[in-house]
Amino acid sequence: MKSGIRNLTEGKIFSTLIRLALPLMGTSFLQMAYTLMAMSWVGRLGTTSHPEIATKSEAAIGAIGLLLWLTSSVAYLAMIGSEVAVGQSIGAKKMKRATVYASHSTTIAIVLSIIWVLILFTFAQPILSFFKLEADITADAVLYLRILTISLPFQFLSYNFTGIYNGAGRSIVPFRNNAAGLVLNMILDPILMFWMDMGLHGAAVGTVAAQLFVFSLFLYQVKFGSRILGNFKFFIKPKAIYLKRILFLGTPVSVMNSLYAIINMNLARIASIHGGHLGMMAQTTGGQIEAVTWNTSQGFSTALSAFVAQNYAANKIERGKKAYIYTIRVMLTLGVAVSICFILFGAQIFGIIVPEENAMKAGAEYLFVMGLVQIFMMFELTTQGMFNGIGRTIEPAVISITFNALRIPLAYYLASQMGVTGVWWAIAISTVCKGIILPTWFAIVYRRIKKKNPKPKVG
């Protein structure tokens, strides 16, 4: 290991991929565990005489969760750009260029975060009114969001540092930092919400404290610890050639995920119109439960992106293809197991988070439909990592944006015929389409790459 990086172009493929993916998956599962635990605490805010307090609070958290999803998607611009640009520079043995890319992506993250905070803080009320929730739920959500804006610049920087470390093959560092932050958040939530009697907004304060803590860990490691890439500068006057490359790599993924978040905001609005706050709660809380497969797939996708970036630059694309095959096998096994649990035990699983009869019934309907299509979702996300690694981020963006956008008119139509369940079926139908088309498209792209370079290095 040199300059805090790891060479992914040598060694056994599966073990190398697993060592890279496990910390990423660990971070994802810790994030999922925290989110579900936070929702579980919120789900217990109600009383026997007023159980609606819990479901209304969950709806408020759900609305905020969608905006945080959009926030993460915006932050992906710098994160993905740095991950691929740094990874490819390292694979090509051009360390100075990797350092320059790290400085540029960090500068982008700082500027983006300031703009985003100003937008969310200033327009919190009209943004959250979009979901058509009751006035008291919207008011709670507005205060919650404004508290969270304190931590967003630090969250953007942490995402950026995560991309840099992933590109350098050091995914264990973000895992440790995020794990520490999540553990702190888990401890703070019940203390702030119940012991200090801050209720729903105690969760927001806990999140702010945890994000500041995670950033401080990254800052220490970059400046005084591993000093990755020679202690690169955080804020510079950007040069067009590097800025363009990062934007080229990061923008499609960022736009894709941002549009995905916006589309889900529209779906939540439709669910709220046809199912009230219970409909929105079922979608947003159910989506967090569904994160067991989403986060696992995203972890492997990110690992593949870093793995393939280095091997593609080193003319060892066949190593990346083999890693993809291994990952698909893992996804298939996990997808079947999760689908069975969602289909057969949806109500019981949902009841762990919100132990209220109406909430359990609504949640079970959502998980049943989603359980039918988990494998297709995992195939799509895994294949995205392959495209990102070879620097072709546009293809998965086109497919994802197209079929996710089709969810809105389909949801309006099906909801008018079937009620709120029609929204779930609109999501499921588009998921199947993406899970079939994207891997097929990659197979075509891979054959073209092989024709251009018929004798790649095996490694």
Residue ranges and their predicted role:
Residues 31, 35-38, 42, 72-79, ...:
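Alpha-helical transmembrane segments and their lipid-water interface positions
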Residues 79, 83, 147-166, 174-182, ...:
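Short runs within selected transmembrane alpha-helices of multi-pass transporters and secretion channels
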Residues 46-66, 136-143, 241-246, 276-277, ...:
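Periplasmic/extracellular loop-to-transmembrane helix junction in inner-membrane transport proteins
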Residues 19-38, 147, 158, 181, ...:
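Transmembrane helical elements of multi-pass membrane transporters/channels
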Residues 29, 33-58, 128-135, 191-198, ...:
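Helix-terminus/linker motif at the lipid-water interface of multi-pass membrane proteins
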Residues 8-40, 44-48, 66-81, 85, ...:
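N-terminal transmembrane alpha-helices
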Residues 58-118, 155-174, 280-340, 344-345, ...:
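Small-residue-rich hydrophobic transmembrane alpha-helices
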Residues 1-21, 86-151, 195-251, 308-373, ...:
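Short alpha-helical transmembrane segments in multi-pass integral membrane proteins
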